[in-house]
UniProtKB/Swiss-Prot annotation:
It holds the Pfam family ATP-synt_B. It is found in: Cell inner membrane. It comes from Nitratidesulfovibrio vulgaris (strain DP4) (Desulfovibrio vulgaris). It comes from the Bacteria. This is ATP synthase subunit b. Keywords: ATP synthesis, Cell inner membrane, Cell membrane, CF(0), Hydrogen ion transport, Ion transport, Membrane, Transmembrane, Transmembrane helix, Transport. The chain crosses the membrane at residues 7-26. F-type ATPases have 2 components, F(1) - the catalytic core - and F(0) - the membrane proton channel. F(1) has five subunits: alpha(3), beta(3), gamma(1), delta(1), epsilon(1). F(0) has three main subunits: a(1), b(2) and c(10-14). The alpha and beta chains form an alternating ring which encloses part of the gamma chain. F(1) is attached to F(0) by a central stalk formed by the gamma and epsilon chains, while a peripheral stalk is formed by the delta and b chains.
Length: 188
């Protein structure tokens, strides 16, 4: 409302000073003050009618427009703040990108070393089991060979002993020897 009064006063003063400037000219005849007064009154009546008929709507329009502009400026300020935050976040992430890359590489290297150690450990255990199994197999084969050799040697000793006894002992001595050992076996 105050702005409208100031605008109306400024318009009236502009018309007044313009008419004064026109009147000071060398045209030879003065202005038609009656026509000028009629025009001013006509303008004031026209402006008053427009103000009465649509004054509230005009004020509401400009007030609504003003509030809309203020709201839009607030929204733009909020969006600007959000954009600055997002920009700062992106810049921070870009700055941290190298350290993140190094961390990821270090993590993968550590995982690789762990897998390598697990594979080596498994291979060592498998080699140990294979070596132990080979030792057992070799021991069993040696034991079997020794047992076979003992059995063969026992057979050969028996054959040699029989042959030797058959050559040195007579049948009578042989029977005495058998009786003697049978008596020992029975008594024990």
């Amino acid at each position: 409302m105050k702005g409208l009064k100031i605008t109306a006063a400024a318009g009236a003063m502009t018309l007044f000073f313009a008419s004064m400037a026109y009147a000071s000219g060398d045209s030879g005849h003065g202005p038609d003050w009656g026509n000028f007064a009629f025009r001013v009154v006509n303008f004031v009546i026209f402006a008053g009618i427009i103000w009465k008929a649509a004054g509230k709507k005009i004020v509401g329009f400009f007030t609504g427009r003003r509030q809309g502009i203020e709201q839009e400026l607030n929204d733009l300020e909020t969006r600007k703040t959000e954009a600055k935050k997002q920009l700062a976040e992106v810049e921070r992430r870009i700055a941290n990108l190298e350290s993140e890359r190094q961390a990821i590489l270090a993590d993968y290297r550590a995982q690789g070393e762990n897998i390598k150690a697990a594979i080596i450990d498994k291979a060592e255990k498998s080699a140990s089991l294979i070596t132990e199994q080979a030792k057992r197999t070799a021991d069993n084969e040696i034991k079997a060979a020794i047992d076979a050799m003992r059995a063969q040697m026992a057979d050969e000793i028996i054959v040699a002993a029989e042959k030797l006894l058959a050559e040195k002992l007579t049948a009578n001595e042989h029977e005495k020897l058998i009786d003697k050992y049978l008596t020992k076996v029975v008594l024990n």
